[in-house]
Amino acid sequence: MAKGQSLQDPFLNALRRERVPVSIYLVNGIKLQGQIESFDQFVILLKNTVSQMVYKHAISTVVPSRPVSHHSNNAGGGTSSNYHHGSSAQNTSAQQDSEETE
């Protein structure tokens, strides 16, 4: 659980801090838009004309309207090296898998 939080907390925090508009897609296909006002382990408070409490288990995807710097600055370090973007992360993973099987 802590591993998942180490990825999502800095990302959501950057979106909240920088007041980046986001689109949140729910698992049922509904698209919500607004700014992340707050969040905890289970919910995200999304503000638009009103504030909505959105349960994380209902969220499929969070899409920022612009790129954000979401690397962790905590004393534990190392977290930022775990971030991967786009196909390069998939290629790296596939390459590691093929090296392990040889």
Curated annotation (Swiss-Prot):
Regulation of its function: Forms condensates in vivo, both in the absence and presence of stress, which differ in their material state. Hfq condensation has no impact on transcription but seems important for the roles of Hfq as an mRNA chaperone at the post-transcriptional level. Hfq condensation also appears important for its role as an sRNA stabilizer.
One Gene Ontology MF term: tRNA binding
Function: RNA chaperone that binds small regulatory RNA (sRNAs) and mRNAs to facilitate mRNA translational regulation in response to envelope stress, environmental stress and changes in metabolite concentrations. Involved in the regulation of stress responses mediated by the sigma factors RpoS, sigma-E and sigma-32. Binds with high specificity to tRNAs. Binds sRNA antitoxin RalA. In vitro, stimulates synthesis of long tails by poly(A) polymerase I. Required for RNA phage Qbeta replication.
Assembly and binders: Homohexamer. Interacts with H-NS.
Residue span, Sm domain: 9-68
Substitution effect: Y25D: Almost completely disrupts the ability of Hfq to form condensates in both growing and late stationary phases
Compositionally biased residues, Polar residues: 70-96
Name under which the protein is recorded: RNA-binding protein Hfq
Mutation effect (K31A): Almost completely disrupts the ability of Hfq to form condensates in both growing and late stationary phases
Keyword annotations: Cytoplasm, DNA-binding, RNA-binding, Stress response
Region named Disordered: 63-102
GO biological process, one term: regulation of RNA stability
Origin species: Escherichia coli (strain K12)
